[in-house]
Amino acid sequence: YKEVPGIQFTIMSTYNFLSMTSYIPFLKDVLDIKLEYHRWDDHRTPMLLDIPYLRFPNHQAIFIMEPEQLQMIYDQVTFMYQNLEYKNWYGSANRGFFEHEADKLKRIYNIAKDNVVTEVTENNRRNFVKFVDEHDKRRGTNFLATFPEYGEVYYKWKNM
């Protein structure tokens, strides 16, 4: 924004199973940028956050999550609402998340909250394990070293 005054851009962050555990740090980074570059006296919005959710492939969508993981999404939505801009006051207008941005993550929370685990879910969980195992094999990577926070569900699903 300093080098190209007046630039406006949108971050499109497709929410998926693997983004769940790191979304608060991501939101903090976005908030820092918003606080630095958004100004109350400027009608332009240098940066917007769009949060669609991944639907396909099914084995990477949030619908494979364990019920206790829903709390992560709840905490992320809460973080966004706690850091909303307040448009009716000079010092806080255009600074922070916009309500429509937080509403997008809230929608994801509500969809996930109403999700029912079925045999299709179980199959997608098994496919997730197959996917990361095959990815590690082909690319020489280590899923559990990269995402140690998923170790418990990985082993649970691997042994289904």
Can you name each region flagged by the protein language model?
Residues 1-155:
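Conserved C-terminal portion of the radical SAM core fold
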Residues 160:
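Sequence context surrounding c-type heme c attachment/ligation sites in exported
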